[in-house]
């Protein structure tokens, strides 16, 4: 029960006043507007919510399966189109290379034939000169004496023989030089044609960048996210088909496409946590050139050996 009676020393007078609200108002009370209650929607049953969630989940999973199947079909179609185009261009390049090689071989055979004809003419002229000198020496020997004429004839014959051998060596050396020069020209023509064809294909065929990206991503050995560096002109195309590239390979969970000015059109560089995979067109072309240059000396040697035998 609260204390109701206080002593004098328990009370302290204050200058401030505290006004207390009346428990009852003596003014005109405002009219309270009656508000009509709105119907409350019934709370759904938890089982119905779970069933709806389960139906949504199944629908979402079916949609994901359909999207994945469609992406795999599109990736397979893209791969087949790329392989067909690459095969067609490879056949075209092979035919062009065969044509150039045939022309170069025909020119080299013509030069070799001319050199052989010139050597035969020189040998015939030398033989004619030798015979004339022998006849002259013989006649001179008869006039001056058999022994002196025979010695003079031997000297002339030895001189002509040495000269003839030198001429033959010069002709053979020229023939080998023609073979080496022709082989070098053939290799240069093939490499030049390859560079031009690859440059045109890389800049004008959108399927080249797609094929290079899929080929490079399939070399990734560990699962995770990777970064793909491409040329500025290929960024938009690669970004549009990013999900198709991910669906076409197994170990790539996420793909980030960035611009790199050091990467030529049609090529790419894949960066992973364990290193990078270089699929630039220039790198592939350089590897092809090295292989051609490694084979070229063998071709020259085999041609020289066959001609010598």
From Swiss-Prot:
Keyword Protein transport among UniProt keywords: yes
Subcellular location: Cytoplasm
GO cellular component: cytosol
GO biological process: bacterial-type flagellum organization; protein transport
Predominant location category: cytoplasm
Family annotation (InterPro entries): Flagellar_FliH/T3SS_HrpE, T3SS_Stator/FliH
Any Pfam family the entry gives: FliH
Domain of life: Bacteria
Entry keyword set: Bacterial flagellum biogenesis, Bacterial flagellum protein export, Cytoplasm, Protein transport, Transport
UniProt xrefs under PANTHER family: FLAGELLAR ASSEMBLY PROTEIN FLIH, YOP PROTEINS TRANSLOCATION PROTEIN L
Family of the protein in this entry: Belongs to the FliH family.
Stated role: Needed for flagellar regrowth and assembly.
Protein known as: Flagellar assembly protein FliH
């Amino acid at each position: 029960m609260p204390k109701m009676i206080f002593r004098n020393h328990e009370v302290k007078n204050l200058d401030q006043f505290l006004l207390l609200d009346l428990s009852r108002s003596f003014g005109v009370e405002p009219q309270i507007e009656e508000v009509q209650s709105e119907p409350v929607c019934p709370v759904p049953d938890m089982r119905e919510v779970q069933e709806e969630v389960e139906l949504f989940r199944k629908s979402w999973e079916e949609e994901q399966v359909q999207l994945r199947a469609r992406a795999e079909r599109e990736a397979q179609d893209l791969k087949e189109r790329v392989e067909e185009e690459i095969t067609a261009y490879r056949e075209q390049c092979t035919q062009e290379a065969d044509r150039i090689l045939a022309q170069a071989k025909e020119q080299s055979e013509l030069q070799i034939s001319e050199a052989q004809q010139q050597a035969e003419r020189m040998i015939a002229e030398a033989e004619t000169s030798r015979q004339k000198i022998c006849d002259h020496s013989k006649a001179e020997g008869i006039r001056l004496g058999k022994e002196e004429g025979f010695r003079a004839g031997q000297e002339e014959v030895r001189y002509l023989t040495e000269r003839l051998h030198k001429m033959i060596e010069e002709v053979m050396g020229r023939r080998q030089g023609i073979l080496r020069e022709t082989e070098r020209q053939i290799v240069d023509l093939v490499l030049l044609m390859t560079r031009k064809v690859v440059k045109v294909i890389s800049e004008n065929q959108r399927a080249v960048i797609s094929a290079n990206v899929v080929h490079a991503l399939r070399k990734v050995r560990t699962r995770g996210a990777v970064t793909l560096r491409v040329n500025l002109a290929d960024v938009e195309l690669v970004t549009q088909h990013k999900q198709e590239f991910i669906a076409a390979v197994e170990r790539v969970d996420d793909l980030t496409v960035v611009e790199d000015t050091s990467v030529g059109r049609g090529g790419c560089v894949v960066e992973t946590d364990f290193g990078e995979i270089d699929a630039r067109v220039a790198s592939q072309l350089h590897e092809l050139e090295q292989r051609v240059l490694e084979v070229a000396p063998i071709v020259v040697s085999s041609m020289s050996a066959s001609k010598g035998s």
